[in-house]
Design a protein with these regions (language model features):
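Bacterial N-terminal signal peptides that target proteins for export
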Residues: 2-16
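Edge beta-strand at a domain terminus
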Residues: 159-173, 200-216
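Contiguous, well-ordered beta-strand patches that form the walls/edges
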Residues: 84-86, 151-193
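Amphipathic, heptad-repeat alpha-helical segments
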Residues: 33-36, 41-75
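N-terminal signal peptide c-region/cleavage motif recognized by signal peptidases
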Residues: 22-26
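Boundary at the C-terminal end of the N-terminal hydrophobic targeting segment
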Residues: 27-31
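Tryptophan-anchored aromatic micro-motifs
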Residues: 111-134, 212-215
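N-terminal glycine/threonine-rich, aromatic-flanked beta-hairpin/loop signature
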Residues: 129-166
């Protein structure tokens, strides 16, 4: 007959085994498949000189999945978008830089409380936009909101021109009229449950215009 100590030990071992299986499954699911690289970009991504970067990325992804309170679909979709950008690289420096940038993103999801942040990705015709845009709406306090954004460009550009930043501060009462402090662009934000519509009448500010879906 099992005593309580034995039962607790079995429960602990079962839990550890389950966690181990989950980690293994996640690592396998998100590990870059280098079993048969059939394109020029995949051959470069799967080369030995990026082995350490691939392993490091896999470990950070599993950690983010297990620890972060960010929505799972957000982790998955941003990872897919990142991989598409990675495949556009034309130099070893670009590949290494993109691995490091993705690891920074995963660390952000892991280290910060995401429960007070709403994440939005831009959609076109029911699909994530071909030129991806990611907006984050942070509830800093009951009367203070911070909106950050990033519009992705060519990863082969210089680091400072690989993306377009967005930054604004507002209040719950003034959430519809937003000014991007980065470029002095004025936008109309229409929050409607799972959908965010962004409009502007200013020329040169169109990059962030569009329809976004929330990740929750």
């Amino acid at each position: 007959m099992l005593v309580n100590t034995d039962i607790n030990l079995i429960k602990t071992l079962s839990t550890l085994f389950s966690i181990g299986c989950l980690c293994s499954t996640l690592a396998h699911a998100q590990k870059i498949d280098c079993s048969s690289p059939n394109t020029s970009s995949m051959k470069k991504i799967c080369a030995e000189n990026l082995a350490e970067s691939r392993e490091k990325l896999t470990n950070h992804y599993v950690t983010a999945f297990l620890v972060s309170d960010a929505p799972v679909h957000l982790l998955e979709d941003t990872h897919t978008l990142w991989f598409k950008r990675l495949q556009q690289c034309k130099s070893l420096a670009c590949y290494k830089q993109q691995f490091e940038l993705r690891i920074e993103d995963l660390n952000f999801y892991t280290s910060l409380n995401q429960s007070l942040t709403n994440h939005y990705l831009k959609f076109e015709n029911g699909q994530i936009a071909s030129q991806p845009v990611h907006l984050q709406v942070h509830q800093l306090s009951k009367d203070r909101i911070k909106i950050e954004g990033i519009a992705y460009r060519n990863p082969n550009n210089k680091l400072e021109t690989q993306s377009i930043p967005f930054l604004a501060y507002t209040t719950p009462e003034q959430k519809s009229e937003i000014t991007d402090n980065e470029h002095d662009c004025k936008y109309q934000f229409d929050f409607n449950k799972a959908i965010l519509s962004v409009k502007t009448e200013q020329k040169g500010c169109e990059r962030f215009v569009g329809v976004y879906r929330i990740y929750d």
